[in-house]
Amino acid sequence: MELKLTKYTAGVVQTNIYFLKNTETGECVILDPGANASKIIEIAEKQLKAQPVAVLLTHGHFDHIMAAREVAEHFGVKIYALEAERELLGDPQMNLSASFGMEICITKFVPVQDGEHLDFLDLDWQVIATPGHTGGSCCYYIGKTGAEPILFSGDTLFRESYGRTDFPTGSERLLLAGIQGKLLVLPENTKVYPGHEGETTIENEKKYNPAAFLGRLC
């Protein structure tokens, strides 16, 4: 199997939107479509010539969900998010869209749970709940790709940094515990694709991410 990963960065806070395509089947998954639905659709249809089969959300902040409904409706696919994020997804104040003069909410989605396995692109996607940035934040881990494992970490784990916890439902204690106990125990060659800025590896984060050390104090 050959996979093609495409990143498109958009929106007021430069959110990374990911497309993972199985080049053999032509299917793709779109993660965190946070802005510019028309461009996301164009990338999938014209640039990648792919057929999206799902929209996955790592959490419910507006900069990760703003284009989700339009993209999902256009392709006739479902949105997936952690059940624990339901309240935040449906509340413009909590998901911060109201702070930018918008009222964005998502009430229709397929709820997933910690440890659940999803089957897309002939791959096993493991849902890893990582509350902290928000109460219903999660990551998606693909252990068997034919190459290095992949982790889509949302705003939980960044390159040598980690997500803010001063927004509604945030908790630094939970965030650090989740990073150390669930993410940094993954294989060191795992490629990490975060919600903002550049990619990294678990090996790098075990060495240089402050969360690797702060978590031991919580």
Predicted feature descriptions by range:
Residues 20, 58, 130:
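Conserved S/T- and glycine-rich ATP-binding loop of Class I adenylate-forming
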Residues 2-48, 139-153:
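Conserved beta-strand hairpin/beta-sheet module of binuclear metal-dependent hydrolase folds
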